[in-house]
């Protein structure tokens, strides 16, 4: 579960390395976000020459969480880290590559571009 002030690794080549959650989008008073949810975040670490800079406010989609995600068949999946992909307003990724696996739940959430760029979908 991702909440305000959570730090996440960035799983794309947009230039950001780490982001800090400012707000969970999707309703007033919503506290937590899971895989496939969109957040507003600020860039805390960035590499030189990237598309985003330190201090930029960006939107991101969560692709991996440490907390379990329950699937319809009753199974659970979790990852070793919390990670997100920075996206534009039209839900397309800023970067051109995705690093690491992403959860299958993104397929149901209009993020097929992220799923197609990912090296592995779990």
UniProtKB/Swiss-Prot annotation:
GO terms for molecular function: large ribosomal subunit rRNA binding; structural constituent of ribosome. Keywords: Ribonucleoprotein, Ribosomal protein, RNA-binding, rRNA-binding. This is Large ribosomal subunit protein uL14. InterPro entries: Ribosomal_uL14, Ribosomal_uL14_bac-type, Ribosomal_uL14_CS, Ribosomal_uL14_sf. HAMAP family: Ribosomal_uL14. The gene is rplN. Disulfide bonds: none annotated. Pfam families: Ribosomal_L14. SUPFAM superfamilies: Ribosomal protein L14.
């Amino acid at each position: 579960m991702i909440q305000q002030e959570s730090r996440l690794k960035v799983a794309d080549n947009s230039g950001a390395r780490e982001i800090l959650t400012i707000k969970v989008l999707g309703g007033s008073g919503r506290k937590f976000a899971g895989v496939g949810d969109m957040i507003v975040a600020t860039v805390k670490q960035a590499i030189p020459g990237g598309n985003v800079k330190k201090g930029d406010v960006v939107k991101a989609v969560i692709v991996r969480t440490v907390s379990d995600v329950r699937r319809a068949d009753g199974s659970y999946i979790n990852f070793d880290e919390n990670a997100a992909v920075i996206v534009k307003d039209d839900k397309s990724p800023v970067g051109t590559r995705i690093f690491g696996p992403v959860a299958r739940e993104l397929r149901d959430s209009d993020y097929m571009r992220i799923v197609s760029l990912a090296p592995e979908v779990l």
